[in-house]
Amino acid sequence: NYICARALINAKAWVPQNRIRAYMLFFHREHFSEEFVLIKFQNFLDSLAEKGKTEDTPFISIRSKAPNLEEYKITKGTWAALQKHKARHLEAGRGFGYGLVDDKKPTRTLSARYAKDGAEILIKEPYWRVPRKITVEEGLALMGYNNTFGKQYGFKRGFTFPETMSKAQIYKQLGNSLVPEILSEIASIFVKK
């Protein structure tokens, strides 16, 4: 007894990350008309999907200027393994492998397995032989968890994680998240103006 509106939305218009997610909303027929769900709301979702296809947010907009990024550097062994893995897949005609960030473009998708080796999103720093992972702050920004947005929802110090959480746990939480600004935009259609 429900009507469904759905869309695949890429978050790169809101945050500097290619992150395509399926958004499916179900409306009970007793409370919402087919006209609202299948026309008005579906058109609204389609416009968000189109925005995600046509607009980009560059990574440079959130890139850390922090002086101490050494702790995020991957090891030489991990870097060698990632390069070997990518070369093997390129040779076989497949596109698997690590991804280096281009500051002018959105990154690849941050996944829950990111803490393992950071392969999806690696950042080259000048004069470094090996790249680094994103910082926790960059991870928060990559998902749209910025201080301005956090304060809007009552988080006085912005979005933070408990100090007892490891970086691996934080990356996993971020990798499993949705971009809150997209959810907020979807919910905005229900707010009476």
Regions found by a protein language model. Give the residues of each.
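Class I S-adenosyl-L-methionine
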Residues: N1-T109, R113-A115
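C-terminal target-recognition/interaction regions appended to catalytic cores
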Residues: I74-K193
